Amino acid sequence: MKLRTISPALALVVAAACTSESPPAPVKCEAFVLPAGTDLLAPPTTFRAAVVPLFVQSCGFSSCHGNALARNAAGLYLGGKDEVPDATRIRKGLLEASTELTSMPLVVPGEPTKGYLMRKLDGDHCLLDASCEGKSCGQAMPRDNELLPAEVRLVVRRWIAQGAKDD
């Protein structure tokens, strides 16, 4: 009887195909629902004192939205960790259209549900995939991480609901 050897590469392919691990479950795309009784008009939420520091801490990495001199992800600057953030510039960028869904502004003052920013932060941007460039609205933000805690997102939501002022 003649024995044949299999190449190590083929052995790895066969072993990988025979493992019992199942592929990761697909991410569910569900609409964010604001908890009943949530007051978006109180307490007052200011952009410079509450929202900008949150963006700098959560989004202001140089590889994401934190480098004022370089092209940032989605072309959006949200303040850098190693600089004094330009709040006026940050707000101006938030009032522009999304690069993934150009028909939708990032922020609609007074209406948090109508802007793309809260969709990305809440993780329900995937409901808009058919309208986005390339038929995908990309990842939730922050990218490759869990969603920000609901109470952190509520700060941004309140600021938008209260008019998205530069205060």
Segment roles from a protein language model:
Residues 1-46, 157-167:
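Post-cleavage N-terminal segment of exported redox proteins
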